[in-house]
Design a protein with these regions (language model features):
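RNase H-like, Mg2+-dependent phosphodiesterase core
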Residues: 2-336
């Protein structure tokens, strides 16, 4: 009897092997009841409300509300159990129907390093076609805050090597950053607005050079209510429909920009750690403060300008200086 020819698996779309979502308390309880009824084995995970292991599948629901489903059976479980029986929403595999704008040719902009004591602020602009966005979603490209540094580096290489993509970043070494921060009136948002406009302008030029056209619009992960980037683009003579909204990283092209920005930031942190002989942590909490004290102790307070954002309160503290008094917050009126 002739053996059935094996179907070429390369022709089949790759199934999703990981899915992350937020569940409210009622949904989390419903999911737990389903897993218990299925006889799945529970196991311990740090910071998890519960975790269960099934055939080819692990499900971990964290106390924060985040639920992570991983393993070969992820896609089938999400489509045939989680969505119909727990969330009541069909999302997986319906990205294009639910968010058609994701698959239009457009630019995405995001930044990294804004809240970190050490290392630069990095602006990134990525311009992609709908086909690129589809491919990136399948590869797991999402907001960089949900990814490890190792995964970010891997996805950064994939994004940059995608044929036809335009990728531009803007950042400067720390001494120059501190100089520009002062020049922009010690207003980080104004400086970031200029950086994003620069990245966007350069990416538009690159994309046009490759494709003889420009995308019709772009999306910025909103960092201020003021249209600072749009104003900078206008000042540069660049006409472009740049939209902005919070949590824009759900858009795959903005997510790609967030990954590119984070990868560049991590590379710079690693370089600075090597230069200073001190492992410089991310963030601006106690670990960063201790690293700053060690750095200043070894190389002197004047060296901090080459490693840290001097306007951070922690940067004053590690040099034994009194931080300047905070200015009272005044909300500006929106333009009519």
């Amino acid at each position: 009897m002739a053996r059935k020819a094996k179907q070429d698996s390369d022709d089949e779309p790759k199934k999703v092997a990981m899915h992350t979502l937020k569940l409210d308390s009622a949904q989390a309880a419903k999911l737990r009841a389903i897993l218990v009824a299925k006889g799945w084995v529970s196991f311990a995970v740090d910071h998890a409300a519960y975790a269960f292991k099934g055939e080819n599948l692990n499900i971990v629901h964290y106390k924060s509300g985040k639920c992570v489903i991983s393993g070969k059976g992820t896609e089938d479980f999400v489509k045939f159990t989680l969505e119909p029986d727990v969330t009541g929403q069909a999302v997986l595999g319906y990205e294009e129907a639910n968010n058609p704008e994701w698959f239009e040719e457009h630019a995405g902009l995001d930044e990294s390093g804004k809240g970190d004591l050490f290392g630069p602020v990095v602006s990134a602009c990525v311009i992609a076609t709908g086909e690129m966005a589809r491919e990136w979603i399948e590869l797991g490209i999402k907001d960089s805050k949900k990814l490890t540094d190792t995964k970010i580096a891997e996805l950064d290489r994939i994004i940059r090597s995608t044929p036809g993509v335009a990728v531009k970043t803007t950042f400067m070494r720390m001494a120059k950053y501190n100089e520009l921060h002062s020049r922009f009136g010690k207003n980080l948002n104004r400086l970031l607005g200029w950086m994003h406009a620069t990245s966007c302008e350069e990416a538009l030029k690159d994309f046009e050079l490759q494709h003889q056209r420009r995308p019709k619009w772009g999306l910025l992960d909103q960092f201020t209510e003021e249209p600072l980037v749009q104003k900078e683009l206008a000042r540069k003579g660049v006409e472009f429909d740049l939209r902005m909204r919070t949590k824009a990283e759900s858009d795959p092209v903005v997510a790609a920009a967030s990954i590119v920005a984070r990868a560049a930031f991590v590379r710079e942190i690693d370089r600075l750690s090597q230069d200073g002989g001190v492992q410089l942590p991310k963030g601006s909490g106690s670990e960063a403060k201790n690293a700053g004290i060690e750095l200043v102790g070894r190389l002197g307070p004047a060296i901090l300008v080459n490693f840290a954002k001097l306007h951070f309160k922690t940067a004053y503290e590690v040099r034994g200086l009194e931080p300047p008094a905070s200015k009272p917050f005044v909300r500006r009126k929106k333009a009519e």
